[in-house]
Amino acid sequence: MSSVTALIYGADKPGIVAKVSGWIHEQGSNVLHADQHLDRQENVFFQRVEWECATGTNPVSEGASFQKMVELELDMKVKIG
């Protein structure tokens, strides 16, 4: 099983969870685990998500594509681990 784990964080806004899970689904991949937290005082949203890549998909490439999407479309920071 090839999986990717990512931590995203940045200003909270509507649609983050939907965008993240939708992107993973569009790749043919499957969410294995997801946790999220909102620091209301600082308005910072955190999400840790792990997903199983579709068969034949390179997890390093998929992680890099995910990072680019999050940074460009959600204007958030990402750590891939």
Regions found by a protein language model. Give the residues of each.
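A conserved regulatory-domain signal marking ACT and ACT-like small-molecule sensing domains
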Residues: 1-81
